[in-house]
Amino acid sequence: MQTDGHTSGAAEDPLVAAAKAGDKLRVKQLLEEADDRCQGDRKDPTAAFAAALQAFHTEIADTLLRLGAQPADVPPEELPSLRQAVDFGSPALVDALTHSSIRHRYPRTELNAMRDLARAWHEAGTEAELRRRTGSSDTIARTRVQDDEYCTVGELTLAGTTVRDGHGAILTHLEKMLGIRTSCQELVARALERDADHTAWSRAAIELSHRRQPEAWATAETLRADADPLRRLFGAELTRLFEVFADSHDEEYCVLAVAALTDWATAETDPTVLAEVLHGLSSYQGPRAEAALLLHTHHHVPAVRRAVAAGLGTPPHSRQPSDAAHQALLTLMNDPDTDVQIAACHSAGDIANGDRALTDTMASLLDHPERRVQLQAVHALARHHDERCVQAAERLGPPRPGYREDETYYLEAAWRYERPREDTSPG
């Protein structure tokens, strides 16, 4: 558990100080500046990683881990204990402390004890256990926080003590580490205690989808037929992940998943569930999947249209979209919802055949008021070898400080396009 006064003072190194303060943007800016000064030799983020963990800034620690931090280089005494992490209820903190490079630091007896601790929190309920430990009947302050790069958890503060409600996800993680096979029903129950953005939900879905066995598939099928939209939503994500984690499109559970999602798309009435179902078709392009997507091109809910737009990209071996898909992409690139426009532009870029109607519509997005739309349009035009990407990239300028990693992805397509043109220019 984290209590008031858990962190104090300021580290001398600016990167460590930014990590300790919880300033993710500054952390990324400092790493970029170090890259520039050292001509490509990135500053070691390991000390900042340790500082972020000590301050319980788990999202920053997760980012630093992705950017090269080495947990094995941090002495155990400079990290929170595993018991502190479990009590705090942060799945990301537990993940960092049990990283593959330092997992050997914990004997099985300790992992068993931590599993029992996580189960105790989970079974008691975060609020009830927090009240028991603090002895306070005051009002609990609640908020939602980013725990890692992708998932959020609830955070509760009472009598100067702060905890997160990720104990169910931690329990799932520790059981997997210990080789304990949790029942499908229990994993579903843990997921449905939370919402779709919570770590407990995603962790249960991933664990179940990796079980390429009849029992797990039957669980997805049962959820699909449930009257409760929340249960169907979890079933849709689980079915989608069966397809995502398949070794090939010919794998048994991939075939089953695509068939189920395609049929499901014609019958689902809940927009949130429908969007998840359609997202499940985005990496499998075929006539039936395309027809299921096109059925919802004009859906009244933007999230559904975004799923349609994302699913209409064409794989490299088949460059030509159908006439209906072509028209849908033109329509969706002019959608009133910005995220729909971005998804449609991305899919149009996937086609990469120089189609004039598509490239002209992409080029119209270069004047969009939002930079993220302009970036996507530059990238898509470059993939179509359309020279309009070059001037547009020049107008956008270099990636913004703190956003280099993301924006470089979009701009470098135009840079790659420009280099051959420069090489062939008369000298």
Task: Kindly label every feature range from the protein language model.
Residues 34-36, 68-70, 101-102:
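Ankyrin-repeat C-terminal turn/loop position
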Residues 36, 60, 72, 180-189, ...:
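Amphipathic alpha-helical scaffolding segments comprising HEAT/armadillo-like alpha-solenoid repeats
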Residues 1-10, 188-195, 207-208, 223:
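TPR-adjacent "capping" and linker segments in tetratricopeptide-repeat scaffold/adaptor proteins
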Residues 8-17, 39-51, 73-86, 106-121, ...:
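Ankyrin-repeat boundary/"N-cap" motif
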Residues 227-228, 269-270, 300-301, 336-337, ...:
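Short inter-helical turns and helix N-cap capping residues of alpha-solenoid HEAT/ARM repeat scaffolds
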Residues 23-31, 57-66, 90-98, 126-127:
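Ankyrin repeat structural motif
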Residues 13-20, 46-55, 79-88, 115-116, ...:
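Structural detector for internal amphipathic alpha-helices that build alpha-solenoid repeat scaffolds
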